[in-house]
Amino acid sequence: MKKQMHPDYHPVVFQDASTGKSFLTRSTVTSERTVEWEDGGTYPLLVVDVTSDSHPFWTGAQRVMDTAGRVEKFERRYGKRKAL
């Protein structure tokens, strides 16, 4: 097998931005931010918007997403069109 064909696969901590829950897993993604884990090791930290700890499919809870602001911003920028 050729060397340098596959990216570096290493331990990484993903943290849910809304719940604060952290998950130690392996990934090819890198980050400048680091965090000290429970085992005493220091790992790259990536903060993500949604994980299994906050996604409605996994939690069974429905949460209202704030999309009204996005729609209004789109309509202001591009104008509201008339229905056909």
Curated annotation (Swiss-Prot):
SUPFAM superfamilies: L28p-like (SSF143800). GO terms for molecular function: structural constituent of ribosome. One of its GO terms (cellular component) is ribosome. GO terms for biological process: translation. It holds the Pfam family Ribosomal_L31. It comes from the Bacteria. Keywords: Ribonucleoprotein, Ribosomal protein. Gene3D superfamilies: Ribosomal protein L31 (4.10.830.30). Belongs to the bacterial ribosomal protein bL31 family. Type B subfamily. Part of the 50S ribosomal subunit. This is Large ribosomal subunit protein bL31B. It comes from Rhodococcus erythropolis (strain PR4 / NBRC 100887).
